Design a protein with these regions (language model features):
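Nucleic-acid endonuclease domains
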Residues: 1-154
């Protein structure tokens, strides 16, 4: 099952964001939950869903390890965009890309497979950051054999 309910603790965060929106309504500010916060939520949720052992922050492109020992990179969005990548010395064996619908407190596993499959859509080398489109990451997921996916534990 690709779609899942976000943990109840996320409700408090979304409600606080909504209160900010209401309070500053005349300023037309979005108070978008994005960046590092969404990335951290993605890692925490992925750890719960797949039994990942998260690694200390080390900037290597590896966020944790799956129960079978595979290294895992977790990417997440709450803004309806595809995943962004940087050039790193060490690539993870596996990639999980999660998309959050915070207004409805739902999440979707968009990509669950070897990271190299997703990276085929990017040039072999680049400077800075490069992103896949939503279409590209979904297409990459169709190329993953079922036995190459991580199994959910929850």
């Amino acid at each position: 099952m690709r779609v899942f309910d976000l943990p109840p603790v996320i409700t408090d965060l979304v409600l606080a964001r909504n209160r900010l929106r209401h309070h500053y309504l005349s300023a037309s500010l979005d108070f978008t939950l994005d960046g590092n916060l969404i990335g951290d939520i993605g890692e925490a949720v992925a750890a719960e869903l797949f039994g990942l052992q998260l690694s200390p922050r080390n900037g290597t492109g590896i966020d944790g390890h799956a129960p079978d020992g595979r290294t895992v990179q977790v990417k997440a969005t709450g803004t309806n965009r595809g995943p962004a990548f940087r050039m790193v010395d060490t690539r993870a064996q596996h990639l999980l890309f999660l998309e959050f619908d915070l207004d409805n407190l739902k999440g979707e596993i968009v990509f669950n497979g070897p990271e190299e499959v997703a990276l085929r859509f990017l040039a072999p080398s680049w400077v800075g950051q490069r992103s896949l489109t939503k279409r590209q990451i979904r297409q990459a997921d169709t190329m993953v054999a079922e036995n190459h996916r991580l199994s959910r534990i929850r």
